[in-house]
Amino acid sequence: MGLLSYILLGFTHPSELRAMIGYKVWRDPLNDIKANPQASGWDRQRMRDCWGFLDLTSRSFAAVIKELKGELSRVICLFYLVLRALDTVEDDMTIPAQRKIPLLVNFYKYLEQPGWNFTESGPNEKDRQLLVEFDKVIAEYQLLDVGYKTVISDITAKMGAGMASYIELSAKGPLKVAMWKHFDLYCHFVAGLVGEGLSRLFSESKLERPWLGHQLELSNHMGLFLQKTNIIRDYAEDCEEGRYFWPQQCWGDDFAKFESQPDVAKGIIEIKPGHFRPADNELGQRSMYVLSSMLLDAMSHATHALDYLALLKEQSVFNFCAIPQVMAIATLELMFNNPDVFKKNVKIRKGVAVGLILRAVNPRDVAYTFLHYSRKMHARLSPADPNFTRWSVELARIEQWCETYYPSFIAAASEGKPTDIRANALRSWSESRRTQALILKQAKLNGSDASTLDAKSVLEAAQNSALDPRDLMTEDERAAQDKRDRDQMVKFFLIILVGMVTFMGIVALITWEIVWWWTMDTPDPLSVYVKHAYYLVKTQGWSTVKEVLRTTRLSFEHVWKHGLTSPPKLEL
């Protein structure tokens, strides 16, 4: 982004510009691979080359992988490079099927062959160099512990076999998927297995609980949520290259009735360069129905992803898993009822992505990010959509999940906004528990019976003896005190600002007079104006001046008493 783009972003989306500045200036990475070269392998040129391959293949994934704790960052880096090399072989259309299938099936065996590489990739393959220098990845792989090697080899074998089966099917014609269950199986091979492998590596590293590696179903949902989002987003590119991943059961059902996946885009028309909308006829409705069905299928994995994230305990692992998930839910919301999906690649803005990264730090914030985007989709959901009921149920599941694990009334109570009767009940209960704890503490100090102590006297005694009065305040009292402190601080800085401006004005005026008197022979215009104003006031009276001064004084008094905050609006 150029300077002009940032300036425009500041006017159109100031919160995103603020997030980008905050990320660049104030956010520090959780871990740095250069700070622990033995664990990350940065002390070896060969491993530094592998980190370079990771940067070339995916900068977004590279950033979160590098922040993983200890040796796990190196392990995940090699795991990603192995699977990326496998995926490069699968996607290379210049390799004939009879050569590609044995390569995919036996790829896991090559990890045990030092010096093996592959130089037959097409010249236009983005990650061709990774396969050319794959011997470096193999050498680093051999340095891993046996547990890590077992997981990586096992996942590579399963994924290679799954990819080979689809290559064999597509050898007779363009690759396409018939039914929803086949679509799930394909996504499992290319992404669900990645989630399974990551969970097993997390457990193997001892950073996460041992049983996390056995959560295969939740791990699969994590991978499918990301993969299905990417498949929907890449519709136009895949159709152009002859890859059809959307299941025929979706675009060829009794309502859609399309003959092929590329035909789905026929219901979308261009209104101006780069902007599209569905046609005002049945064809346009059927196209948007297919998009709605695909998005709904992807959304079915959302709450399962939240279940998985709630199991994680290591912060760097949580960030690694959560950031792609919040990106996915934001992308799904952007594609919801968006006909541009059929004609071009739809991506969230960079500022939005940075804001999501800053918020994806704990399960509650991630859950409420999901809730935020689900509500945005629900606001645009049309009853005319044949999937309206199913969409309502799926979005309500996210609402229910958040309310079950992170109830809104607890958030309301902590923020001092009693919008829910449960918040008042929670506040009263918390205050009674605090008072009871103080009574028990005072009784223990005095050696007296707690039942004989008066709550009011105990609170007064505690307030008098407390080192910090805030420790004995309720949430509401602490919030009110914070507001008073902020107002006092604003008043203080206002006085300082006025004083500085006044002083600088006086210095500027004196300098002006001296320079004019020293360099000019005529009277300075400022003195002439002041004299003119003085005689004007003298002749016309002081009533106007007094009224202006009175209004100014009342304004300053209002700011001094009430601060700079405006009174709340009356809501009916």
From Swiss-Prot:
Topology in the lipid bilayer: Multi-pass membrane protein
Cofactor: Mg(2+)
UniProt cross-references to CDD domains, sorted A to Z: Trans_IPPS_HH (cd00683)
The reaction(s) this protein catalyses: 2 (2E,6E)-farnesyl diphosphate + NADPH + H(+) = squalene + 2 diphosphate + NADP(+); 2 (2E,6E)-farnesyl diphosphate + NADH + H(+) = squalene + 2 diphosphate + NAD(+)
Subcellular location: Endoplasmic reticulum membrane
Cystine pairings recorded for this chain: none
One GO MF term: squalene synthase [NAD(P)H] activity
EC number: 2.5.1.21
One BP annotation, GO: isoprenoid biosynthetic process
Main location: endoplasmic reticulum
Membrane-spanning parts: 316-336, 492-512
GO CC annotations, alphabetized: endoplasmic reticulum membrane
PANTHER family, A to Z: FARNESYL-DIPHOSPHATE FARNESYLTRANSFERASE, SQUALENE SYNTHASE
Annotated function: Catalyzes the condensation of 2 two farnesyl pyrophosphate moieties to form squalene. It is the first committed enzyme of the sterol biosynthesis pathway. Required for the biosynthesis of ergosterol.
Protein name, entry field: Squalene synthase
Organism: Mycosarcoma maydis
Lineage: Eukaryota, Fungi, Dikarya, Basidiomycota, Ustilaginomycotina
Underlying gene: ERG9
